[in-house]
Each structure stands twice: as structure tokens, then as C-alpha cells.
């Protein structure tokens, strides 16, 4: 259709539109052999052991089906596993048969009819039912294999989603082992292609009712296996990025821009820049597309700066100012404040000063100055903001102009994730926090450590790594603990007493108005960004 998408619908949307049969998904723990969970390297004898067969039988009988007659598909990792498991399940009274690509089409159709007629309870297979063959009466789908791709996962799950008068819902039982690809499960179930680890963790933690009767449930151990896979997988590796880029490029029939990845629910564009190969989107296009974008070093540098500083969209102010400057060349400070008021954003002097610091590059710490230089992107003269003349010259290059505007548009789109300057449940780096608390200069993480008081803004962010690495020094292995949903037991830095100036300032925060904000990360493996949990007040007499 000349690259106009005629119709595309995600699993969740199809369920909401009553186009598919609802399903109840159970992610269950696979068995352990000699204390180790089944994984990609498990041999056929372990996959078909009597212990595993009993485990499978226990789960498929426990979770059952919506009526008394099972019509199930069991997806296995190999033909040998399918055949051997079929034999063993039959020995336990089940009526099953293995079907593989080796069987001719007439035989397959005969076996499918036996399942539909109730002569069989289960067909075991590897991938011949991924697509193309529908058995509307299937009411249970069992997955005994590693998830190879989110597309295949949905195809296999979908074998049971055709509506049929004999069923109200389909039971999906997914046996989750110690698989590297477990991170694909939330991508498939929730239709989330963002490659944003925090999104996936959030989706797994929250109660999941996709639509109507459709629910997603995980045994705790199975859920932990997925969390582990999410943590250990580099979602910004070149193959994942290339697949995401080319998938959208093929869909659109043109070069996708950053904003396209967002509006078409593709990869979160931030993930491209988690890969050190890419400093700006021109690098991405030149790597993955046949199109060639030529930028001067100056153009590339400015594009890299706004990508680094503004694309995450954690504060709208800078983006709005740049958007106005691109339109009109200059804007008065009064006009900028008027724009902020229209957007219902704060116009405090401290925030305006912080915005000016960021766009003049004064906020950068020394290592970033080496990368981006000291030339301001925006200047303020006689209460009028102007774009650097060097940047204005760059706009003569249409590719630069397109890419620069794209960063602004994508950054503004991403600000929707941050309705407040600090949004509870969202993640922030120490650098983000310094900027959003309006500190005049970014502080190196080592200077901040677990907390730092900024006298100019009267603020003190507190950063806690909840599970400490065993290898860190005992002197900084603080025993911070959340006692309940509203109370934190917190330790000051090492070698402090109640008379230490920073401790006294924190204790006296109810009187001195010190703004205490809490940021927590589970452990160092989750990266350098912390979840914002809210403001802190001192519990009296503690």
C-alpha cells in the first residue's frame, strides 16, 4: 500500500476489541536438575526425565482448562523432546502425539482432527503450528521451550486465541527456566518494544490484567528469572538496535526519525545512545541505513550535545526555549516565561537560572567540557535569548536542521513520562538530580556518594543502593533499610557524629527547610539511575 500501513493491531488491542479469545497466562518455574534450573544447554535426558514429566503433569492439571475436555498444544525445544515426552505423557494416562515437520500434510490434518474430536488431548510439536494452521477449539497452550523471539512467542500463544463456542478463555502455561532470552517474555506479552529495562521491570511488578478476563501471572521464582535476564542482557547491542531500526524503516518505507520510534511504539530512542558507538542520530542512520548523512565536526558536536542533554525529556523548559528560538531566532526572557506559564510549568528564578546554565554549557563538568567545549548553545543579552551564531550557520545544512528539530520533538514527546520535575517511580541519575534541583554545576558521582547538601539551593538528595555488593568496603556498606512503606532507617556517611555539620543540617531540616529527596536502586547491576521515591522528613526523637 505504498508504505501506508493499512491495518496493524497489537495483541492487547486485539483483546480489547474482542477480536480474540481471552487468555490466562501462568509463568511457572521449570524443574531443577542437581540444583540448577533447566537452561539452553540442558540435554535431552534432563528435558524428558521422569522428574520433569511429573512436574509438567502437575502444572497442566493444576491450572487446567475452562471446561472438562483438554485440547492442548505443547511446544517443545526439539523433535526428540516432543517424541519422548509424548511417549512418557501417554504412560501417565494422557492421550498425546508428537507432530513434526517430518510428517506429511495429510497426516497432520488427520491428527488435528483427532484433537478437535476429543480423541487426543495434546499435540506436541516444535514449530509447525507457529502460524498458518488454526485449531479454534484449542484451550490450553504449554510452552516448554526457550523463547527465541517475541514474534514466535506471540505466534505460539496465538494458536489458542481463536474464538470457539467451547471455551471462554485459554490457559497458557509457560515453563520458565534459566534462559538468557527470558527478557523477551514481557516484550511479547505486553507488546512493549521499547527495549527499556525499567519499563519491563515495572510491567512485571504491577498486577497485570491485559483486558477483561485476560491476566498475566508469574510464580515468584519464575519472575526472578525474567528479572535476572533483563538485568544481564545488553538491550543496546548492535543486533537488537539494527533489528529495531530496520523493522521500522521497512514499515515506513523511509528513514525513521527519533520521533517515529516513539509514535510507532518502537524502540525507546534513548537505547540507541546507550551504545557507545552512537553519539547522535546521524551515526545511527549512517550505520543502519543506505542513506548517508554528512555533518561537519561542529554540526556533529552540537547534535551530540542536545541528544545527550535534552533527548531524555526530564525537563521541558530547555526544549521549549530551543523550539521557540528555532522558530524566531530570538526570544525575550519575558516571552519565555509567558510560554512556561501557558504550559503550566514553574517559572522560579532558580529554575530559569538552571536552564540558562544548561544551555550555556556552564553546568557541564570538566570531562563533558572536553567533549562538547565551552561555547554556549544559547546566550542571554539584555534579557533576550539568542542561538549561538555558529549553530545558526549549521542550520543551513538541511540534514542538520532536520536532525536537530527531531531531537527537540522527540524530547518533548518524552516529557510526557515526567509530569512533575521529580515523578515518583521514575528513574534519575545523580547528574539528572543535580540539574533538576537547579544546582549551578554538575557534581562528579564520587563527590556526592550517598548524599550531598547544596547550600545555594538548600537541597539534599539521598541515594541508596539497597543491596550492597559483597566486595565493597565494610566502611561504606551501610545498613539502610525500608522498615515499611513510609519509614526508612538511614545511615550517614562514615566517620560522622551527631555533631558533624552535614548530619546536624539534615537532623534540623524541619527548622531549616532543607529539601530531602530519596532515590533508591536495588543493586549496582541495575545501572546508574535511581528510582525517585519521594520527599523525606525526619521522624522526631529517632
Task: Please place each PLM-identified region on the residue numbering.
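Acidic, glycine-rich low-complexity segments with interspersed aromatic residues
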Residues: 304-306, 310, 316-321, 325, ...
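Conserved segment of the helicase C-terminal RecA-like domain
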Residues: 150-155, 159-190
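Compact mixed alphabeta submodule
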Residues: 523-542
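Long, largely alpha-helical accessory region at the distal end of helicase-like NTP-driven motors
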Residues: 63-67, 71-72, 78, 189-319, ...
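Conserved interdomain linker/interface between the two RecA-like ATPase lobes of SF2 helicase motors
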Residues: 5-76
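SF2 helicase motor core recognition
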Residues: 18, 123-138, 158-162
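Conserved helicase ATPase core of P-loop NTP-dependent helicases/translocases
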Residues: 83-87, 94-129
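Charge-dense, extended regions
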Residues: 341-460, 468
Amino acid at each position: 500500500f505504498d508504505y501506508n500501513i493499512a491495518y496493524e493491531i497489537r495483541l492487547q488491542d486485539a483483546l480489547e476489541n474482542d477480536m480474540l479469545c481471552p487468555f490466562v497466562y501462568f509463568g511457572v518455574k521449570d524443574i531443577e536438575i542437581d540444583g540448577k534450573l533447566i537452561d539452553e544447554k540442558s540435554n535431552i535426558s534432563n528435558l524428558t526425565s521422569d522428574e520433569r514429566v511429573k512436574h509438567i503433569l502437575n502444572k497442566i492439571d493444576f491450572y487446567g482448562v475452562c471446561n472438562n475436555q483438554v485440547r492442548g498444544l505443547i511446544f517443545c525445544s526439539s523433535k526428540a523432546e516432543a517424541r519422548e515426552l509424548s511417549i512418557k505423557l501417554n504412560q501417565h494416562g494422557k492421550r498425546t502425539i508428537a507432530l513434526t515437520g517430518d510428517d506429511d500434510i495429510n497426516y497432520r490434518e488427520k491428527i488435528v482432527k483427532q484433537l478437535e474430536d476429543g480423541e487426543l488431548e495434546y499435540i506436541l510439536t516444535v514449530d509447525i503450528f507457529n502460524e498458518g494452521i488454526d485449531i479454534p477449539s484449542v484451550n490450553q497452550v504449554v510452552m516448554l521451550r526457550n523463547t527465541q523471539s517475541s514474534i514466535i512467542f506471540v505466534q505460539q500463544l496465538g494458536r489458542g486465541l481463536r474464538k470457539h463456542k467451547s471455551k471462554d478463555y485459554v490457559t497458557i502455561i509457560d515453563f520458565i527456566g534459566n534462559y538468557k532470552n527470558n527478557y523477551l517474555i514481557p516484550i511479547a506479552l505486553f507488546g512493549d518494544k521499547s527495549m527499556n529495562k525499567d519499563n519491563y521491570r515495572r510491567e512485571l511488578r504491577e498486577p497485570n490484567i491485559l483486558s477483561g478476563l485476560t491476566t498475566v501471572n508469574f510464580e515468584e521464582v519464575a519472575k526472578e528469572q525474567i528479572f535476572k535476564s533483563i538485568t544481564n542482557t545488553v538491550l543496546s547491542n548492535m543486533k537488537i538496535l539494527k533489528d529495531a531500526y530496520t523493522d521500522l524503516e521497512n514499515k515506513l518505507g523511509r528513514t525513521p526519525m527519533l520521533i517515529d520510534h516513539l509514535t510507532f511504539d518502537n524502540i525507546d530512542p534513548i537505547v540507541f545512545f546507550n551504545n557507545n558507538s552512537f553519539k547522535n542520530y546521524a551515526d545511527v542512520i549512517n550505520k543502519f541505513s543506505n542513506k548517508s548523512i554528512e555533518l561537519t565536526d561542529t554540526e556533529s558536536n552540537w547534535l551530540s550535545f542536545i541528544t545527550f542533554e535534552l533527548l531524555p525529556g526530564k525537563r521541558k523548559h530547555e526544549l521549549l526555549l530551543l523550539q521557540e528560538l528555532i522558530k524566531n531566532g530570538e526570544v525575550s526572557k519575558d516571552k519565555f516565561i509567558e510560554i512556561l506559564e501557558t504550559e503550566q510549568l514553574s517559572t522560579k528564578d532558580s529554575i530559569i537560572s538552571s536552564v540558562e546554565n544548561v544551555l550555556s554549557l556552564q553546568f557541564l563538568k570538566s570531562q563533558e567540557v572536553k567533549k562538547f567545549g565551552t561555547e554556549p548553545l544559547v546566550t542571554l543579552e539584555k534579557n533576550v535569548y539568542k542561538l549561538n551564531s555558529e549553530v545558526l550557520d549549521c542550520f543551513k545544512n538541511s540534514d542538520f536542521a532536520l536532525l536537530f528539530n527531531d531531537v527537540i520533538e522527540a524530547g518533548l514527546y518524552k516529557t510526557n513520562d515526567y509530569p512533575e520535575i521529580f515523578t515518583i517511580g521514575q528513574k534519575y541519575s545523580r547528574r539528572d538530580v543535580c540539574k533538576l534541583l537547579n544546582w549551578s554545576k554538575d557534581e562528579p558521582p564520587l563527590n556526592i556518594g550517598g548524599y550531598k547538601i547544596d547550600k545555594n539551593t538548600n537541597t539534599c538528595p539521598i541515594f541508596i543502593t539497597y543491596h550492597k555488593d559483597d566486595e565493597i568496603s565494610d566502611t561504606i556498606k551501610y545498613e539502610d533499610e525500608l522498615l515499611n512503606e513510609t519509614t526508612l532507617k538511614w545511615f550517614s556517611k562514615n566517620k560522622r557524629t551527631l555533631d558533624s555539620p552535614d548530619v546536624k543540617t539534615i537532623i534540623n531540616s524541619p527548622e531549616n527547610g532543607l529539601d530531602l529527596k530519596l532515590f533508591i536502586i536495588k543493586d549496582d547491576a541495575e545501572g546508574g539511575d535511581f528510582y525517585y521515591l519521594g520527599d523525606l522528613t525526619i521522624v522526631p526523637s529517632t
